[in-house]
Amino acid sequence: MAFSIPIPKFFRSKELIGVDIGSQNIRIVKLKHSGNKWTLVNLVKDTIPQESISSISPEERKSVIIDKLKKLISSARVDTKKTCSSISGGSVIIRYVVFPKLSPQELSQTIAYEAEPYIPFSINEVNLGFHIVGDVEEEGQKKMETILVASKKEFLREHIEILRAAGLQPTIIDIDALALSNSLEVNNYLPSDATVLALNIGASLTNLIIVENGILKIARDIFIGGNNFTQAVQQTMGVDFATAEEMKKTYGLITPQEKTIEAKDEKFRVGGALASVYRDLVFEIQRSIDYYLARSPEKSIYKVYLTGGSAVLKNIDANLSNELHLPVEVFNPLSNIEVAPHIQPFVENIESAVQLSVAIGLGLRREGDA
């Protein structure tokens, strides 16, 4: 599954590095392809300190990210500066729409006109991209299901400026949701005869996708992430962010079997704080499932995959399975990818591996992908 927002290209070369700039972490990967096998040959990463970053201006934050990118690129010693990176968040709009049947070339030429009714911004303020899902017929007319992506020009411009200021050459701009889909696909997590739902629970938001028979049907961002869980603990327990983060990891969510714990118990108080955010997340997940099933009443969800930093929050998989009445499994984006020996110590535990799902999806891309 491919998508890109067109940006100027400087050189022609297929190999790219995947650059995942999240709200809390930066990850850069390089993947090599040989035969039917992918190998992770390079990985560098760094964190963006939350408490210090929240007290500085957007321009200062931008400088911090550029500086960290420069240091990571220097330490990685990669043989290309061409990148595939991704965007997400409030300045990125993802819509599932049905357009008149057109070729990709025709849609590229008319996308502004076709997209205008679906975009809550002025069409002149956004860059547009699309991913054609497949053909459908409505009232005897041939049409096509399409995932439409609009990014505010200012937001995209800043993203590109950051990459260039760090000495990189932005070549493909993707979205997190499609990178996640690519990551699932290469690891053989997308059956050709079933529908799966995947959640990438990052620091500030959750990417949700629903993939039917290997075809992406729904992609959206939910503005709930690991930091929301941490902040809920911080507020309830009256501690700083770092302490709240440790409490979150130590105790996790309360299971139905643990509901008898005394209310004054620290585990119960932390679990109660986490539960308030968790309920909001479940509500949004269920909304997406209901929307999908309303459009495809003959279908059902086969399985839910969890990835991202909060995929390993204690009991979140069991609780989600109980709430959604579906099997839930943690997705390891390296399960079908070889890892170079010098990288293995950094990804051998699942807590580290699940944070690479978007980066791996980006690293799979090659210049010239449709």
Model-identified regions with their sequence ranges:
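Hydrophobic/aromatic-enriched cytosolic interaction surfaces used to assemble or bind macromolecules
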Residues: 1-370
